[in-house]
Each structure stands twice: as structure tokens, then as C-alpha cells.
Amino acid sequence: MTLANKLTLSRIVMVPVVIAVYYLPFSFSGVLAAVLFVIASLTDLLDGAIARKRGEVTSFGKFADPIADKLLVAAMLLPLCGDGKIHAAIVFAIIAREFIVSGIRLVAVSSKTNSVISASWLGKIKTVIQIVAITVILLGNWPFSLINFPMDQILIWLMLTITIWSGADYLIKYWGIIGETK
């Protein structure tokens, strides 16, 4: 197994750790969860860079990397929703998009072309915005709360917008593959 794939798997392993820390009964659990969430998110940058630098880009990595991102993001959206920090309809829309895009990827792999769909530039921007938004929410909108600026709310709406946009982009680009399954 390549180092890049190990980093991807480590991101998946960190998901329950970040959630457990978020629920710890002390005042700085959100901050600690944010730190762990950022560390887990940074493995997303590292795994791709390492795979490309070493010439170790694999089909597993192309498929597992976006799944690891989705797990990390969805796993944090749910408790934030449960705590009333993000509206349930927004979380539903984001998670629904992730299932739809994952479904498109599965169909592409099982199609006649046996295609592995890598993350698009728009999908990568979406992931970065989701990570930034979740981090700011975990930090209680700090440092923006010091100047009474609702950055968390702005990021939530930006996250929803880019998520829907990138989902529509995948649907438009890969709609033809859906009819080509074996």
C-alpha cells in the first residue's frame, strides 16, 4: 500500500476520533475537535501531492480520497446539525449531493468505459470551503465573533452553494456514463 493511500485511510480512521472529541464534556472540546479536523483535512492535501510526486496515483486513491473527504465532512455536519449550528435542510442537501456524486462514480467504474472519475477542480474547491466552514463553526465563529461578524453563516451558505454547483457540474459532465453500464 502506498504512503498516499495510507494517509487517505488515516483520514477515515480519524473521523470517529474527531467526533468523540467534539462530544467531550469540557469547554474547549470544539477547539480540540477543530484542530483534529484540520489535521485530518490536511491529509487530503498531502495524499494527492505525495501520490503525484512519487508517481503512485492509484485507482484506489482516486476513489477512496473523495470518499474519505465525504466521510469526514458528513460526520462533522451531523453533530453540528444536532447542536443547531447548521440547519438540517442544508446538511441534507450537502449529504445528498455527496451520495449522488458517489453514485455517479460507482456507475462510471461499472460502465463499459470502466472510468474512475477523479475530483474536479470545482469539487476540490467545494471540499476546501466545507473544511473552512466546519472549522469556523467548530471554533464558535472565532475570531469573527470578536467583531460580531457572522462569518460562520456566510460560510454555511457558500458551502451549500458550491456543493450544489459542483454536484450539478458532475451530473452534467457524466450523465452519459449512466446509460452505458454493463
Task: List each model region and its residues.
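Alpha-helical transmembrane bundles and membrane-interface segments of multipass inner-membrane proteins
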Residues: M1-K182
